[in-house]
UniProtKB/Swiss-Prot annotation:
Its EC number is 3.1.-.-. This is Shewanella-like protein phosphatase 1. Mn(2+) 1 binds at D64, H66, D102. Disruption phenotype: No visible phenotype under normal growth conditions. The keyword Transmembrane does not apply. Shows phosphatase activity, hydrolyzing the artificial substrate para-nitrophenylphosphate (pNPP) in vitro.
Length: 389
């Protein structure tokens, strides 16, 4: 029944006003006859962004980062969008970068990574590009107050960041953008002042938990920052989400899901009419951020199960007008890969030192074609490319 209903759906134009990102004057597209044409602007629909038209842009997808700033930089440099001189400059020109969630937990530089992506987005827009994020299950868990997977040093970063905000007279935007350039010094200062007994300091740890709660509870400054991003994003005819989009999500409404998650994140919970955590997006094995339906190894499935998953995937893609879906969430021991006729791409390689500590890999998309970019196993500065149709 779900597939019949899905086949009757059309990807209707979003109702939200459009935002235009104008390419820089130097952004030119070379045609087959040697002429150069100016790129069309990027058009964003939805709040948070849900549907993006990025004509003739190169798209790069990066998987789960889990608080590892070093690996995040490696991945972004591998993607060709981050400078390698330590200045954290955007060098991707008009590239569109999409990070598919799970920046939080398991590492100690979470806010620094979020700050880096915001800084790169500002720089990218000036060059006709853009940076997008979708929230993962670890973002929604933290806004819910579930800190089970937080690295002890990440609590310290939250404490430092709250103290740092005082230097900016609570000017959030300026402080947040600059944290990537300041966080290293704060981290070094903290390390130099620590003693062996600090790890057993209950008061210090409690202070970190309180700082994290202040920042990430619904309505908190960092929760509001996360609310700028949805859990589902379509760029051209490519769909991005953390766990996986399913037929009942499409029937419920993609924009509606994004809007409800965003509203929940930015709304304080101390009111009777405060919005509840959107279950369809954030809770349960079949929610947008938790689903692993498309990420299981097909070798573990029976033929009839593979057929079922394949039908669910392609019905979903047809309903939203997408060629393929890109997901994170489940580390892929074989690296970035595709299944079901390359209708699904799995880009979480467990690169964070808090997960598998594997070498970064990224997915590059040009038009309807995608390829995996990975570093050479022996020499990091050499790149290997695996092409897919």
């Amino acid at each position: 029944m779900a597939s019949l209903y899905l086949n009757s759906l059309l990807p209707l134009p979003p109702s939200h006003p459009q935002k235009l990102l104008e390419p820089s004057s130097s952004s030119l597209l070379s045609t087959s006859n040697g002429n150069e044409l100016a790129l069309k602007p990027i058009v964003i629909n939805g709040d948070p962004p849900t549907f993006v038209s990025a004509p003739a842009r190169r798209i790069v997808a990066v998987g789960d980062l889990h608080g590892d700033l070093g690996k995040a930089r490696d991945a972004l440099q591998l993607a060709g969008v981050l400078s390698s001189d330590g200045r954290d400059q955007w060098v991707g020109q008009d590239t569109v970068l999409v990070q598919v969630g799970d920046i939080l937990d398991r590492g100690d530089d979470e806010i620094a990574i979020l700050s880096l992506l915001r800084s790169l987005d500002d720089q990218a827009k000036a060059n006709g590009g853009a940076v997008f994020q979708v929230n993962g299950n670890h973002e929604t868990m933290n806004v819910e107050g579930d800190f089970r997977y937080v690295d002890a040093r990440a609590f310290d970063e939250c404490t430092d960041f709250l103290d740092y905000l005082e230097d900016y007279a609570q000017d959030w935007d300026k402080a947040f953008r600059n944290w990537i350039f300041e966080s290293r010094q704060w981290k070094e200062d903290r390390r130099s002042s620590q003693t062996y007994w600090d790890q057993w300091n209950v008061v210090k740890r409690q202070k970190g938990v309180i700082a994290r709660s202040v920042l990430l509870r619904p309505g908190g400054r960092l929760a509001c920052e996360l609310s700028r991003h949805g859990v589902i994003l379509r760029v051209n005819n490519w769909l991005f989400c953390h766990g996986g989009l399913l037929p009942h999500h499409v029937a419920y409404g993609i924009e509606r899901i994004n809007r409800e998650v965003s509203t929940w994140m930015r709304s304080p919970t101390n009111y009777e009419d405060s919005p509840q955590m959107p279950f369809i997006a954030t809770r349960g094995y079949d929610s947008v951020v938790w689903s692993r339906l498309y990420s299981r190894e097909t070798s573990e499935l029976e033929d009839y199960q593979i057929e079922q998953v394949n039908k669910i995937l392609h019905d979903t893609l047809e309903a939203v007008g997408a060629k393929a879906m890109v997901v994170g969430h489940t580390p892929q021991l074989s690296g970035v890969n595709c299944e079901y006729g390359c209708g699904i791409w799995r880009v979480d390689v467990g690169m964070s030192s808090g997960v598998l500590d594997s070498r970064p890999e990224v997915l590059e998309i040009r038009g309807d074609k995608a390829r995996v970019i990975r570093s050479n196993r022996d020499r990091l500065h050499e790149l290997q490319v695996a092409d897919y149709i």
